[in-house]
């Protein structure tokens, strides 16, 4: 939750006027629980969405980086409160995305062309099964960690939110 990519996501969404909520999945950082191969982590996402809707948030967007994008993509099929989703470097070379079916909420996927965990070609192959109208933004030179490329990532997110604002 405290890395350059998540910090950029939070900053850009807040600057665009969004209320943001970020959390560590179970067993990460100071969070309780044990890693649950994505199953329990989906429950974490659903609990966070429930928390927000109980506080009057009606329009919800999800944005996830790496493992978080995978868990979000799996969890979103079981909720009806999410309007849009952004995936940053979905780890398609590392996690099984085959069970992510048609998900119209997926609007934007961002990956670096040097990312070996989220290879652009694999994402291009999977994207039509997730949402054929989703946009893939490739950041030249960026790897999975976006060191030296967070400014470009923030520009991509800012443009997306300007076009798809709250």
List the model feature ranges, each with a label.
Residues 45-105:
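Primarily recognizes the serine-hydrolase "nucleophile elbow" in alpha/beta-hydrolase
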Residues 103-111, 115:
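Short beta-strand/loop motif that positions the catalytic acidic residue
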Residues 129-145:
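Catalytic histidine neighborhood in serine/cysteine hydrolases
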